[in-house]
């Protein structure tokens, strides 16, 4: 990306009372605009045309297009194309393992000027304090971070979280200027059963935006769920499911994260006809993938390479996304719109060269001027120390359920294996890629430990462990030996949470995440390289997964079918009940 530090430093901020007059004069060409982008073309998302025109900016607004303008500061964008800033409509910033300030530095230069986040992860650990941390951060970031209030903390009664958020805990935040509405309503069984607390939250936010989360929900049950006032869905994993939800009035957020990769499957619905009802999201994407592939820019160029019309995907990335969430001040290159702009090399390449956020040219100087936000959630890992004996199965039967990993998906399979029973109970079968999985309660509530088996990691030795474990973020460990499972779990307690790879009792790689056991205090570049080392260490153990730690993070999520494990035991998500090994 090309940086233009001097522009944002030289433009004076004017008094608000004179703003309207200045915008009118600059838009009408009577006065020089604050900034003019000259020599390029912009993508008109209404007609689909590439328009040769100057773009005039006054303060944080576009004031002129389809004309020639004089500027106090002029930026030559000859040979390039200007598009509206990209909007990520559903993500968990904590899943990037960096703070909101570092997320800002990481993705804004890629063209993401607005991010609509759910602080669900930190809320499950810290409760209202975690939401407050995100709102305070959102007031300081250069990009516009909007917050959806976490609706399901905990996600279900089938796990132990660090906190619980009832409607009375959410209402004090409802009128915060950065709050849009209610985040993904994962407890769709609770909605359909008219659970009193679910009803209280839904009633309180009627008329405001309520995000959905209803994987594989179809037919009349889907109708009932939508009738509760829920507007969007990011869990559609195939075109047929997405089309049903579109036909029933939902907006579909097309997701491509580090684990959940649904873009290819949903490409058939990304058309000019459907684009006004679509948006893009990443849900969970880590800095390593952002560095190696990109963020929403990656989704855009991947979709176009797959045959999607550029107009359709750029509409979904900006104007359609803005309309879905009621952000009518952005999404177009047009007068009166917020000056969130991305200068790209081409529509197909979508490589950001210059980014403007609210009329400011993005630069390191702009990031350096932000006010810091105090850290929260230190020393949050309060798990009991464990030994190998804590993970030994006492079953006398070799017939054992196993969680089946589906690469690139967070949906799992409900499998059964006939495993060998040894002196320490049921044993892993490395030849058939069946190893142990354990979840350890880490909030200091009850010390629960649950064990089971998982198929699909490819481990031949050692263990990998994490405190990033949706949604309650207890310790989750997968390993080929009980001893290494214990070593990895104990190490997480020593480093305040994070990721660990262990073999033969030795730590091969680790990354501390001391902010609530979820986020690093380091710059995103440091996190990126630590993730690279962790991925290589997991590969050395035999892991066959592209993103083993985020895949691990979803094993304990009991709102995504089909078989999961929490600190309380194995969960058959289809029946929403605990099941034996």
UniProtKB/Swiss-Prot annotation:
GO terms for biological process: adenine catabolic process. InterPro entries: Adenine_deam (IPR006679), Adenine_deam_C (IPR026912), Amidohydro-rel (IPR006680), Metal-dep_hydrolase_composite (IPR011059), Metal_Hydrolase (IPR032466). Keywords: Hydrolase, Manganese. It catalyses: adenine + H2O + H(+) = hypoxanthine + NH4(+). GO terms for molecular function: adenine deaminase activity. The keyword NAD does not apply. It holds the Pfam family Adenine_deam_C. It comes from the Bacteria. Belongs to the metallo-dependent hydrolases superfamily. Adenine deaminase family. NCBIfam families: ade. This is Adenine deaminase. It comes from Brucella abortus (strain 2308). The gene is ade.
